[in-house]
Regions:
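Redox-cofactor-proximal catalytic regions of oxidoreductases
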Residues: 45-89
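Flavin (primarily FAD) cofactor-binding/catalytic cores of flavoenzymes
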Residues: 2-45, 52, 90-250, 254, ...
């Protein structure tokens, strides 16, 4: 009797946006190539597609990118807007900024519909956390928080932004129950008392969402960061991107900065707005970043990143208007400064800031966002990979170092194990690697590379079945 060889197994570690998009691409491309395999989505979360970004249920938490740019499929830019019309009710325009919860639902439905329609690969969702991965030349052994082990032929780390590891937190605050380390952890904002002022450390996009969520009558929300800079805002009617001129001057940071500023100024003179110029840089950002020397990259990450981010990653117009209203009413203050110390006082916290200022607050919430350096976070999987030399930090210490197709580079520098990553983990190599327009393209590239690496298992596959969800959002479907 001849036994049937087991199907190759691909692990996707993480079921947020990056992991879900990768699983979708693996299922679609495996079907197109006739590759039989098992795709294992590994994450303790009950539903795929949500992750830290899209698990919020607050309808005031909006996407920071217009709906027309948020399709999950690179080849079908209207896919998300068709889904909104077909599945979310109401009428949506490409320029609308919709609730993030809707996008999480969209990703979940897309994955379910893809698994139903494309049958060459089989999707399995294991609700467990991967805490270690022993990478070999042909087989990866995963260890889970539950103690279980599993062997796979290839793995994709879709870990999302690094967990908070704020270096700014003084000793008197670190273990205090009134300090919220991660505002997106389950139930974190529910711990904020109904009364008393609140200090938010960080003035970026996270702060904007948290300020709206914790606002109460009679409360002042204080937002603090070293620069005091708030993100710029999108226009309600975004203009199309303006392509930059050929930026082939000196490959140093100073020369590139001059060229980019000239592009912004020229675009502003021509159309009255700098935003289209910055949006036009999106397709070439990774190439420009790759031209810089290691020293210039490190210098930019240290000195220039914040100014770039406040212009590049902008607020939805509605969110910006809410912040304006809170500031005008005296319910939100924004200032530059740093936390020096904190101590319990009168049932709350007395927080000492630079400049001799003190605040009395009920809660302090870290809104500084994800750190860049994986060596600074207490993540068991990342710690194991780095300690074992199966991975190394990316340029400037940001993320993990990868080859051009997202394959992890070990300490020795030559890709060996069939182990890939995408999204936030590639910031050191690409700079811009956290938004869906970048991640969806990376997911397609990673899926293609993974499938090419699998042991030959091409067999006849069932004819794709068209699911009800897929039909409802097909091009040309009734609106």
């Amino acid at each position: 009797m001849t036994g049937t060889a087991p199907l190759p197994r691909v692990a996707v570690v993480g079921a947020g946006a990056a992991g879900t998009l990768t699983a979708v691409q693996l299922l679609r491309q495996a079907d197109r190539r006739g590759v039989r395999c098992v795709v294992e989505l590994l994450d303790p979360a009950p539903l795929p597609g949500r992750g830290a970004a899209y698990r919020t249920t607050d309808p005031r938490h909006l996407l920071n990118v217009p709906a027309g740019r948020m399709s999950a499929l690179p080849e079908d830019p209207e896919h998300f807007t068709r889904w909104l019309t077909a599945r979310a009710g109401g009428t949506y325009r490409p320029g609308d900024f919709v609730p993030r919860a809707l996008y999480g639902r969209y990703l979940g439905e897309l994955l379910a519909g893809t698994a139903q329609r494309y049958r060459a690969a089989r999707l399995v969702h294991h609700h467990d956390r991967v805490v270690d991965l022993a990478a070999g030349p042909a087989r990866q052994v995963l260890r889970f928080a539950s103690g279980a082990h599993r062997g796979v032929d290839a793995a994709v780390l879709a870990l999302g932004p690094l967990p908070p590891a704020p270096a700014w937190v003084p000793a008197g605050l670190r273990a205090d129950a009134r300090f919220v380390r991660d505002p997106w952890a389950a139930g974190a904002l529910e711990r904020v008392p109904e009364h008393g002022d609140v200090l938010l450390v960080g003035t970026g996009l996270t702060m904007a969402d948290v300020a709206v969520a914790v606002d109460r009558a009679g409360r002042t929300v204080h937002a603090l960061s070293r620069t005091g800079l708030l993100p710029e805002r999108h226009r309600p009617d975004p203009l199309p991107p303006v392509d930059p001129p050929v930026l082939d001057g000196p490959g140093d940071l100073a020369g590139l900065r001059r060229a980019v500023l000239h592009h912004l100024a020229t675009t502003r003179r021509r159309c009255g707005d700098w935003r289209p110029a910055l949006d036009g840089l999106r397709p070439v950002t990774a190439a420009l970043w790759g031209r810089l020397s290691p020293a210039d990259r490190a210098r930019f990450l240290r000195d220039g990143l914040r100014a770039w981010e406040v212009h590049r990653h902008r607020l939805a117009p509605e969110t910006a208007a809410r912040l304006d209203a809170l500031r005008a009413a005296g319910r939100l203050t924004v200032r530059a400064g740093e936390v020096l110390d904190a101590a319990p006082a009168d049932g709350g916290l007395r927080v000492r800031l630079t400049g001799g200022r003190e605040l009395r607050v009920a809660t302090v919430i870290d809104c500084t966002g994800a750190p860049l350096d994986p060596r600074t976070v207490p993540d068991p999987l990342l710690g194991a990979l780095l300690a074992r030399g199966a991975a190394r930090p990316g340029p400037g210490g940001a993320g993990l170092d990868t080859s051009s197709d997202g394959r992890l580079l070990p300490a020795g520098g030559r890709p060996g194990a069939p182990l890939w990553t995408l999204g936030a983990a590639r910031r050191g190599n690409l700079l811009e690697s956290t938004a869906v327009p970048e991640i969806r393209c990376q997911a397609a590239d990673v899926a293609a590379a993974v499938l090419r690496s699998l042991p030959g298992r091409e067999r006849p596959v069932p004819t794709p079945r068209r699911s009800a969800v897929d039909h409802a959002i097909a091009p040309g479907a009734p609106r």
